[in-house]
Amino acid sequence: MFNNKLFRRPLSAMAFMAAILVSATTISCTKDDDDKDNDVVEAETFSGKLTVNFKGSDFTTDNITVRVSDVVFSNSDKTQGTLSLNFEKVKFVPQMPVSLDITVPGVAFKIISKNKAEISGNGIVPLTGGKGYEMYAVTGLTGEITDENDSSRSDDSISFSLKFGDYPTSYSGVEAD
C-alpha cells in the first residue's frame, strides 16, 4: 500500500521552498528594474516664466507652457539621451504679431542623480510648423530637470538658458497640473 502522508509532507516543503525561491527572484528582479527605472526625464508639461533679452531689454512672460517630449534613451542604463522642448503659444517679445508653437529637438540630457538631469544643446535648429529656422539656431543651451518624487506634493521643475540666434533666453517652470 501507498502511504500518502509520507509523500505529502516532502511535497509541501518542496512547494514552500519553490514559492520562496520564486518570491525572492521576483523581488530581486523588481529591485534591479527599479534601479534602472529613471523617471527624472519623461514626457511632462511645465508652466513657468520666459525671459528674453531683446535689444538690451528683458521681456518676461509668465504662464508659458513648455513640454518635454520625444524622450529617447541612448544607453541601456537609461542615464542619457535626447528630448524635445516644446514651447506652446509663445511670443518672445510683445512686438511679435502672433504666438507660435516652437520645438527645440535633439536636446541632450544626462541623469546625474536620482532626481536630477542636466540638459544641453548647441547648434540646434528650432522648428515651427515643421519648418526649421536656422537664423534662430539654439546655442549655449544649459539647464536641469528635477523630479522630487514626493507623493504629498509636486516639486518637479525645469530651468534652462539658451540663445535663439542672438537673443539670450531663459525659462524656469514647475510641473503643470
What do the predicted segments below correspond to?
Residues 14, 41-47, 115-117:
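Conserved long hydrophobic alpha-helices within structured protein cores
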Residues 116-177:
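Beta-sheet ligand-binding and adhesion/scaffold domains
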Residues 10-18:
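Sec-dependent signal peptide hydrophobic core
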Residues 58-141:
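Predominantly extracellular/secreted and cell-surface proteins with exposed
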Residues 2-9, 21-50, 154, 159-177:
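Bacterial Sec-dependent N-terminal signal peptides
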Residues 3-4, 15, 64-65, 70-81, ...:
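Extracellular low-complexity Ser/Thr/Asn/Gly-rich intrinsically disordered segments
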Residues 41-67:
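N-terminal segment immediately downstream of the Sec signal-peptide cleavage site
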